From Swiss-Prot:
Its EC number is 7.1.1.-. Keywords: Cell inner membrane, Cell membrane, Membrane, NAD, Quinone, Translocase, Transport, Ubiquinone. It is found in: Cell inner membrane. Belongs to the complex I 30 kDa subunit family. It is a peripheral membrane protein. InterPro entries: NADH_DH_suC, NADH_quin_OxRdtase_su_C/D-like, NADH_UbQ_OxRdtase_30kDa_su. This is NADH-quinone oxidoreductase subunit C. It catalyses: a quinone + NADH + 5 H(+)(in) = a quinol + NAD(+) + 4 H(+)(out). It holds the Pfam family Complex1_30kDa.
Length: 207
C-alpha cells in the first residue's frame, strides 16, 4: 500500500477529515484546527508510519484570504525515510492548538510563529519574544507590517541604557537607479592610437 493510502486509511479510522494538497513533490495534507492534534498523534503513534520527528513548524501570511495565515508542519518518519507536510489555515481571530504535548520541539517553533505573525497557540502560554526584542511592537513578517517598524532602538546617553522611541529616519527614502552614471569618453586618450584591431588571443576577446 502506498504512503498516501496508508495515511488516508489512518485518518479514516480515526474519523479525521484531511484534504490532499499539492506542494511540489511532497506529500501534503490540509486539516482543520480541531483535527490537527488527533492527526499528529495518530501519525506519530502509528506502527506503520512512525512520523516521530517534527523537523519544522512555520507560518506564512496571505492577507487577501479570509483565512490569511498558514501554519505548516513538516514531519519525518525515520522508519520510512519519508517526509510529510501538514497545513492548517486560520483567520486572524482564530487560534490553533499547541502540539507541545505531542512534539516537545514545537514550543520554540510556536513561539517563533507568534513572534513573527501573532498567531496564538492554545496551550502554549509562553509568549516571550524569541527572534525580536521583548518590547518589540507588532509582528514583522505580516504583509501589512511597515518596513520601518513602529519604533526604533537607540542607546540613550542620559539614561545610560537602550531606549525605544518613535521612528525617525536619518536617511530619506530614495529611488534607487542602478544604471551607471559613468560613460566611456568620446575623445581619444593618449596611446589609444596604438591599439590594434585584434586583442591578443589569450585575453579571450576580439574587437
Amino acid at each position: 500500500m502506498t504512503l498516501d493510502k496508508l495515511i488516508e486509511k489512518l485518518a479514516a479510522k480515526s474519523s479525521i477529515l484531511i484534504t490532499p494538497i499539492i506542494v511540489k513533490d511532497y506529500l501534503a495534507y490540509q486539516v482543520e484546527p480541531n483535527f490537527l492534534l488527533p492527526f499528529l498523534k495518530a501519525l506519530k503513534e502509528s506502527e506503520e508510519l512512525r512520523f516521530t520527528v517534527l523537523t519544522d513548524l512555520f507560518g506564512t501570511d496571505f492577507p487577501e484570504r479570509d483565512k490569511r495565515f498558514e501554519v505548516i508542519y513538516n514531519l519525518l518518519s525515520l522508519k520510512l525515510n519519508k517526509r510529510l507536510i501538514i497545513k492548517v489555515y486560520i483567520s486572524e481571530k482564530e487560534t490553533i492548538p499547541s502540539a507541545m504535548n505531542i512534539f516537545n520541539a514545537s514550543c520554540w517553533y510556536e513561539r517563533e510563529v507568534y513572534d513573527m505573525y501573532g498567531v496564538n497557540f492554545d496551550g502554549n502560554d509562553d509568549k516571550r519574544r524569541i527572534l525580536t526584542d521583548y518590547e518589540f511592537e507588532g509582528h514583522p513578517l505580516r504583509k501589512d507590517f511597515p518596513l520601518t517598524g513602529y519604533t526604533q532602538v537607540k542607546y540613550d546617553e542620559k539614561l545610560k541604557k537602550v531606549a525605544y522611541e518613535p521612528v525617525d529616519l536619518d536617511i530619506e527614502y530614495r529611488e534607487f537607479d542602478f544604471s551607471s552614471h559613468w560613460h566611456s569618453p568620446s575623445y581619444v586618450l593618449p596611446g589609444d592610437e596604438k591599439a590594434t584591431d585584434v586583442i591578443p588571443a589569450k585575453a579571450g576577446i576580439q574587437k
